[in-house]
Amino acid sequence: MGKSVVVLGAQWGDEGKGKIVDLLTDRVKYVVRYQGGHNAGHTLIINGEKTVLRLIPSGILRENVTCLIGNGVVLSPTALMQEMGELESRGINVRERLLISEACPLILPYHVAMDKARESALGNKAIGTTGRGIGPAYEDKVARRGLRVGDLFDKQSFAEKLKNILDYYNFQLVNYYKVEAVDYQKTLDEVLAVADIITAMVADVTTILDVARKNGDNILFEGAQGTMLDIDQGTYPYVTSSNTTAGGVSTGAGFGPRHIDYVLGIIKAYCTRVGGGPFTTELFDEVGAEIARKGNEFGAVTGRPRRCGWFDAVAIKRAIQTNSISGFCMTKLDVLDGFREVKICVGYKMPNGEIAEYAPLAAKDWEGVEPIYETLPGWQENTFGITDVNQLPENTRNYIKRIEEVTGVPIAILSTGPDRVETMILNDPFAV
């Protein structure tokens, strides 16, 4: 029997999902993106060569894997063509191995213009979006006015729909945000120039997955961003516009929840966050700066510096609840090498004096929250590239064990470097 495994971020994104997906794809026939868009930067380093994938599933680097983009993904034609071009220039066959749901909402230039205009208007209260039009595209989907991949099959109808929706957007952009209108003809020409390439890859993703499951094929679902950025379960309003949790697999790929066998939550050995929003364990001292330096904590897509802090088990417990996490993959363990002590946040002291074991939902409920830490001895030894858990320093193993105890979830995979070989698989999700 085949296995269906979900790989998702259990923190605020940037946990190292791309590497782990790539690592596990030698076991699978299909890799599926089910939410988000080209705001997700998945960095892979294979034999020293760096690849950043934003929209195309990370399985594209394995010749035996078919990659699927489900209906929950918002798709930018421009970003897709650029990414395909980069991969094809390296001899990677994309067009015969990438299939796209016709129900994917399209991200078009007016979405990007609106995203940037809104963030600019918010000033220091900005959400911290990537400015790539993700939110406005999801808005159009929910409002039932958005254009989808399937609309590209009828170019005349597409042109008419585009005219109507662009009038709607330009009225807001010009009259409310006082910015330049988006040109209709330029937008239309750009999309129609690549329409045939995109429609040639359209397929019934739900049926493909159902047949694969019945045939006993292994399937991997690749999440983007992280649990605490989920539109419903995250630190609202400082969230993304999609369901980043495991439930997004069903709504974003048409795969029934009963058929999910394992949920692998990716966690860093510490915590990071990009953009605004609450972050209880954030460090503003030299320790935080050192973690950022050693971890090279800059966004793969935006290049923005990430905020850094100690491991937050309280936030992780919320992620465990919302995802039914089966096991963790801990990444960037080596970044904590050399610290005299390491800390784990095991509780939140709320403004009313109560102790919370689970993170609040709304951002406003995080105000005035203080972290309650357990302090453990650090380790001076170098763990970079270690591939045998028994070779890890005793204090490193104690740190890992304590996180397992506090969260109640076992660590199935350990990563000690960016390359796929710098990994320890303690419990293979596809062998469970």
Curated annotation (Swiss-Prot):
It comes from the Bacteria. Pfam families: Adenylsucc_synt. Its EC number is 6.3.4.4. GO terms for molecular function: adenylosuccinate synthase activity; GTP binding; magnesium ion binding. Mg(2+) binds at residues 14, 41. GO terms for biological process: 'de novo' AMP biosynthetic process; IMP metabolic process. Pathway: Purine metabolism; AMP biosynthesis via de novo pathway; AMP from IMP: step 1/2. It is an enzyme of class 6 (ligase). It is found in: Cytoplasm. It catalyses: IMP + L-aspartate + GTP = N(6)-(1,2-dicarboxyethyl)-AMP + GDP + phosphate + 2 H(+). Homodimer. Plays an important role in the de novo pathway of purine nucleotide biosynthesis. Catalyzes the first committed step in the biosynthesis of AMP from IMP. NCBIfam families: PRK01117.1, purA. HAMAP family: Adenylosucc_synth. This is Adenylosuccinate synthetase.
